[in-house]
């Protein structure tokens, strides 16, 4: 869905150039990625589009009717004509760079947006470990950015530090930090912006951080580096039943917290 957002003219009114998105999807199948995007457009869950969403009333899985099927086909057809190219087979960094060069020569009038998801799945050639791979990935990204004035988005993963009991149980330690990024030092320096996405609910945290925000469906994007902007926190709510991600303000989160506290007192 990230790539699709860049093609949304309403979201990107200030774009002055046509774009081409080269999406290196080593982890998730491109078909799954596109299906999730279509589900979001139709405000349905991913499971619903696969006819695998359990219906409590009928005690059976959902069935897609003819109208819904037609709507789905229309959305898939729209995506076919968007400037996004998906690459599912992982290669080494030299092959990735060659691929970018190849398409840059074909689409000379477009600005490039390159996403790599995720970086640790690139094949190693001269690299002996993940640290060397991440360091070379950073160097590769810098070369491509300078060569084509491209936007490079690197998706990495967290290590296990944030899952430790001391982190989960201490509200002051629950926010993700730089050291939580796997091989973070090797790529942090190369990035203009670094954002860590975190779902505290998945770690069994009910009240998140020193603010004690309710964690149900909460997404926390910690902006820990912003070369031309400000560091801070972005709060979102996941409505998975409709494949939506909604923005939340701190005041809205505080309101939810107060409602939870009121309900707790009423139960007592």
Regions found by a protein language model. Name each.
Residues 1-58, 118-123, 190-192:
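Walker A/P-loop NTP-binding active-site region of P-loop NTPases
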Residues 23, 115-116, 150-157:
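Structural recognition of the conserved hydrophobic beta-strand(s) that form the central parallel beta-sheet
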Residues 127-141, 151-152, 195, 202, ...:
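A short alpha/beta connector and helix-capping loop motif
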Residues 22-24, 87, 153, 195, ...:
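Hydrophobic/aromatic beta-strand patches that form the interior of the parallel beta-sheet core
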Residues 39-41, 131-133, 170-171:
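Glycine-rich, phosphate-binding/catalytic loops in enzymes
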Residues 81-144:
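Phosphate-binding/switch loop-helix module in NTP-utilizing enzymes
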Residues 121, 157-164:
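Signature of the SF2 helicase/ATPase Hel1-core->accessory helical subdomain module
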Residues 12-16, 43, 47-63, 67-77, ...:
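C-terminal regions of RecA-like/P-loop NTPase motor modules
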């Amino acid at each position: 869905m990230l790539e699709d957002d860049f093609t949304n003219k309403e979201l990107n009114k200030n774009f002055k150039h046509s774009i081409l998105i080269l999406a290196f999807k080593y982890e998730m199948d491109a078909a799954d990625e596109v299906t999730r995007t279509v589900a979001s457009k139709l405000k349905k869950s991913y499971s619903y589009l696969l006819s695998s969403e359990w219906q409590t009333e009928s005690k059976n899985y959902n069935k897609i009717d003819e109208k819904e099927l037609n709507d789905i086909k229309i959305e898939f057809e729209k995506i076919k004509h968007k400037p996004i190219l998906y690459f599912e087979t992982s290669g080494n960094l030299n092959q990735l760079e060659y691929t970018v060069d190849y398409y840059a020569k074909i689409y000379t009038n477009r600005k490039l947006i390159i996403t790599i998801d995720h970086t640790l799945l690139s094949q190693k050639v001269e690299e002996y470990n993940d640290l060397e791979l991440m360091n070379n990935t950073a160097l590769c990204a810098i070369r491509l950015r300078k060569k084509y004035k491209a936007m490079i988005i690197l998706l990495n993963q967290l290590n296990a530090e944030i899952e430790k009991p001391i982190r989960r149980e201490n509200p002051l330690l629950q926010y993700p930090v730089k050291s939580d990024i796997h091989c973070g030092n090797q790529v942090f320096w190369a990035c203009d912006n670094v954002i860590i996405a975190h779902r505290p609910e998945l770690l069994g945290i009910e009240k998140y951080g020193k603010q004690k925000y309710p964690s149900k469906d909460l997404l926390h994007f910690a902006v820990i580096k912003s070369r031309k902007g400000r560091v801070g926190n972005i709060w979102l709510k996941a409505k998975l039943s409709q494949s939506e991600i909604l923005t939340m303000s701190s005041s809205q989160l505080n309101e939810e917290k107060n409602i939870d506290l009121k309900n707790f007192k009423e139960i007592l």
